[in-house]
Amino acid sequence: MKFLDEAKVYVRSGDGGNGCVAFRREKFIEFGGPNGGNGGRGGDVVIEAVDGLNTLIDYRYQQHFKAQKGENGMGKDRHGAGGKSIVLKVPVGTQIFDEDRETLIHDFTAVGERFVLAEGGNGGFGNAHFKSPTNRAPRHANPGQPGEERWIWLRMKLIADAGLVGLPNAGKSTFLSKVSAAKPKIADYPFTTLHPQLGVVNADGREFVLADIPGLIEGAHEGAGLGDRFLGHVERCRVLLHLVDATCEHAGKAYKTVRHELEAYGGDLTDKIEIVALNKIDAVDPDELKKQRDRLKRAAKKTPILISGATGEGVKEALRKLADVVGEQPVSSKAKNAVESAATEEPWAAPVPPQG
């Protein structure tokens, strides 16, 4: 299943049905009076957060959604049936934005949460509604009210307890594959990870969900590399694990590069609890390791954990620190179910311009 975290869709609720002008016609009853029924109410456009989804790919191929129109009223005081509502299913963590892409309309945070995005139009009154002592035979009825229509943006942010950040090739995917059942693509070149990955981690009996996002490079907030758009998927995390490659030229500069991109992105990412780890310690000699550790300690103003995703050294300590921050709150079932789909190697699918 391809990963798509943003989509633009058009929605329109149903128009209300028209009221009916009709009169009672029976033998020997000369003035039967009005009996035109009311029109039915138009269907709503409803968005529902469901379990088991972790992509908006369905909205890449269909962008127009219209609810059913209410039926017209009929004679003999028969009211029109209401139009059928349409329900759009989205993953938990999806946000609805107005067409300007900035105005937040709703944020889905729980399975089963529903939001009426566009209400159907009310049905028009039939002529029986207008009968009064002074108007015994009204010959007019109301048309149904039109439904609402609008363009919206759906933006999904994965729900995870902890997030992995770092430069490309910092060893994030290797770390995730070692501590969970996730199977991300791993290779010795930058940007191996093209879309976020999720894994369920068990640290001393405490489970939490860990998210790995594509690596950041200098200028990512300006669109360099894969940009910083995937940082939205760690906005909901309670803690960040910042991995720095011990084999890079300068661990301190590598750390500051990522921190600068987090600050430029915003979203309070720099205010989150951060655990710093120097990775790939098995690939450098002791003297170089000490230099890199000291550089990273000065830049981060905290002592980094020394780990190796390949050998497993220091990994348990990092997981315990993450679990201590995450706490004992249970992992959402949505995040667990997303792991299998998130581990696929399908490329990220860019949103396509809506047709029509």
Curated annotation (Swiss-Prot):
An example Gene Ontology biological process: ribosome biogenesis
Principal subcellular localisation of the protein: cytoplasm
EC number: 3.6.5.-
Domain Obg: 1-159
NCBIfam families tied to this protein: Obg_CgtA, PRK12297.1, PRK12299.1, small_GTP
Entry keywords, A to Z: Cytoplasm, GTP-binding, Hydrolase, Magnesium, Metal-binding, Nucleotide-binding
GO molecular function: GTP binding; GTPase activity; magnesium ion binding
Assigned protein family: Belongs to the TRAFAC class OBG-HflX-like GTPase superfamily. OBG GTPase family.
Residue span, OBG-type G domain: 160-327
Cofactor requirements of the protein: Mg(2+)
Function description: An essential GTPase which binds GTP, GDP and possibly (p)ppGpp with moderate affinity, with high nucleotide exchange rates and a fairly low GTP hydrolysis rate. Plays a role in control of the cell cycle, stress response, ribosome biogenesis and in those bacteria that undergo differentiation, in morphogenesis control.
GO cellular component: cytoplasm
Subcellular location: Cytoplasm
Pfam families: GTP1_OBG (PF01018), MMR_HSR1 (PF01926)
Subunit note: Monomer.
HAMAP family found in the cross-reference section: GTPase_Obg
Protein name as catalogued: GTPase Obg
Residue numbers binding Mg(2+): 173, 193
Binding residues for GTP: 166-173, 191-195, 212-215, 279-282, 308-310
Annotated region (Disordered), positions in chain: 327-356
